[in-house]
Amino acid sequence: MLEARFQQAALLKKLLDAIKELVTDANFDCNDNGISLQAMDSSHVALVSMLIKSDGFEPYRCDRNIALGINLNALSKVLRCAQNEDLVTLKAEDTPEVLNLVFESEKNDRISDYDVKLMDIDQEHLGIPDIEYDATITMPAAEFQRITRDLLTLSDSVTINASKEGVRFSCKGDIGNGSTTLKQHTDLSDQDQSIEISLTQAVTLTFSLKYLAQFTKATPLATRVTLSMSNDVPLLVEYKMESGFLRFYLAPKIGEEDEE
């Protein structure tokens, strides 16, 4: 049996808002370590990987490994019935047909009970290799979201160039060109505003802005975001949470770097 309680419905809502337009149906894999999800988007261009560790729940119980196949839009609709401050308890039997959600108000004067039908999803697990990335950029999540939105008004592709001068986001479109360059700096008054760049060699890659803009829907989950890049491998965009992470992997566009 699974029983896992979020202290606030807001976290689960934010997680679903970040991934539900990339992935329609997915397995939530529950085991001793916590609840994880790994799924590709329908175009097989982006991969989503999420983990909420068991210590992110209070209480957490999972007697055996369970895969909960869920339509994310259906789950999101049910979660709209919860107030952001509500406690949310997820429950499932060992061979479940439904995921039970119980919403409890802060004052414990309201309890709502919902069941979401589960699906049988045949999903292969992709081994994500551990890569020593050539460039790692950690920056304010809101800044990354702003850059992505701004450049998306001009083009559908962005070239990210990480070098010792800094990291440059540039694009070319029908109505003109645009670029933003960030340089490493430490903000002593607010560490969350610092920009950290770790580099072993320069990297230049081009990506779909539509997907990057989609990833930035995770901005409410974390104040910081980390971009990890190496030539010819997918970009890793990671949002770290208190008890886990949300990671997005995006394959680079081939043969477009020269056009930029």
From Swiss-Prot:
One of its GO terms (biological process) is positive regulation of DNA repair. One of its GO terms (molecular function) is DNA polymerase processivity factor activity. Belongs to the PCNA family. There is a cross-link at residue 164 (Glycyl lysine isopeptide (Lys-Gly) (interchain with G-Cter in SUMO)). There is a cross-link at residue 164 (Glycyl lysine isopeptide (Lys-Gly) (interchain with G-Cter in ubiquitin)). Pfam families: PCNA_C (PF02747), PCNA_N (PF00705). Gene3D superfamilies: DNA Polymerase III, subunit A, domain 2. The lineage of its organism: Eukaryota, Fungi, Dikarya, Ascomycota, Taphrinomycotina. Disulfide bonds: none annotated. This protein is an auxiliary protein of DNA polymerase delta and is involved in the control of eukaryotic DNA replication by increasing the polymerase's processibility during elongation of the leading strand. Involved in DNA repair. Keywords: DNA damage, DNA repair, DNA replication, DNA-binding, Isopeptide bond, Nucleus, Ubl conjugation. HAMAP family: DNApol_clamp_arch. Homotrimer. Interacts with pcf1/CAF-1 subunit A (via PIP motif); the interaction is direct. Interacts with cdc24. Interacts with rfc1. Interacts with rtf2. Residues 61-80 bind DNA. This is Proliferating cell nuclear antigen. It comes from Schizosaccharomyces pombe (strain 972 / ATCC 24843) (Fission yeast). Its main location: nucleus. Monoubiquitinated on Lys-164 by the rhp6/rhp18 complex upon DNA damage, and then polyubiquitinated through 'Lys-63'-linkage by ubc13/mms2. Ubiquitination contributes to efficient DNA replication in the absence of DNA damage. CDD domains: PCNA (cd00577). GO terms for cellular component: chromatin; cytosol; nuclear replication fork; nucleoplasm; nucleus; PCNA complex; site of double-strand break. It is found in: Nucleus. PANTHER family: PROLIFERATING CELL NUCLEAR ANTIGEN. It comes from the Eukaryota.
